[in-house]
From Swiss-Prot:
CDD domains: GT4_ALG2-like. Its main location: endoplasmic reticulum. This is Alpha-1,3/1,6-mannosyltransferase ALG2. It comes from Saccharomyces cerevisiae (strain ATCC 204508 / S288c). The gene is ALG2. Glycans are attached at residues 170, 303, 371, 400.
Amino acid sequence: MIEKDKRTIAFIHPDLGIGGAERLVVDAALGLQQQGHSVIIYTSHCDKSHCFEEVKNGQLKVEVYGDFLPTNFLGRFFIVFATIRQLYLVIQLILQKKVNAYQLIIIDQLSTCIPLLHIFSSATLMFYCHFPDQLLAQRAGLLKKIYRLPFDLIEQFSVSAADTVVVNSNFTKNTFHQTFKYLSNDPDVIYPCVDLSTIEIEDIDKKFFKTVFNEGDRFYLSINRFEKKKDVALAIKAFALSEDQINDNVKLVICGGYDERVAENVEYLKELQSLADEYELSHTTIYYQEIKRVSDLESFKTNNSKIIFLTSISSSLKELLLERTEMLLYTPAYEHFGIVPLEAMKLGKPVLAVNNGGPLETIKSYVAGENESSATGWLKPAVPIQWATAIDESRKILQNGSVNFERNGPLRVKKYFSREAMTQSFEENVEKVIWKEKKYYPWEIFGISFSNFILHMAFIKILPNNPWPFLFMATFMVLYFKNYLWGIYWAFVFALSYPYEEI
């Protein structure tokens, strides 16, 4: 018998790559595993050359089903194929009788499979909602809206079948209620975590840093993908308006994900470069992949540049920049959560962010005379002059030491956003629901009844006067699905159909 406090847990995730959602799944699985629970991750895709180290080295058990299925057709219908791949995965788990091997199944991102699991599994089902999928989809044009409609309805229906729903922030929780107005679920919040261990800085990144920055240089930092919705322009405008940028040794470093095959990345980088020109701020653009191709790093000298654009940097260089920056400028509005501010705070760096979305929960905004002992940065409207004022205020505070960001940031991250804190939240939410009896929904009862009725009629039509299929179904229901009610039904049908007069 399984001990009450040691659970068997399975995660179901669409694509176990190296994104933020994947990092959350890996951290959650590791945290629960370290608490003594038995954990496995099921996914439709996992490339061992492009995944997190804990997956690559076998620290976490991962099984893949359905990777042979396409992810799209001619660059379209991604949601259709994501649904097909997930349903294939779950059907394989059902056929292999794995769905009843777990006390808890955590479904991440895509909810389509939840009703199927609810019918065929005895496990408690938890859905982790990063953000309603229907709000992430683009709906340009009537055809696109019509195309998305059934998937929006499926999302609302499938989420309702979960035993419990959790979300990544109170901001997402409010959005969940506004989106799924007909659901009674009241999600709890489980914050994503940040790895508290430090990343080893590669030698090439140390050399590059010494080449790009002179002794005594200071810089503000922006880390975001080169996309318009990230509003990186706000950082440039605020920096240009700040008093601190007048100093020759002060720079702004803008770095983030960039793919030259993605038109938006290319266009937005050009737009930011043009904006720097408008403010008469000299700038240099460095494509990180070129660094390892060049033997002489002196070609990357940026002595006269006020703004440095860096594309697709390594985790090592990202860590080094966060360690050395004056402050992180986190520009996106209405972020669902936002992990980068936590990465800065864990290193004791202040963060300036927009006063909405996830940062309202992660950053403790400085209020003079009130919270010097706990402040970790500033939350301001996306108004350049207000951000410029915050930049200058941060400089004064760092000089006079009235706020100890080096202490406040790590303390806040460890308390609320560590792997231990996230694991504890998961365990608390599991214990709330895992002891409850399985709920049977009207649609579920109708669906099962209708399916059995159709089978019954099919047997009568295809195999008239043959009772043995009914006995097979009775045995199948009891031994395979552990459904004794329908086992009794089919046994009763068999008894009524058996030709006793031939005995």
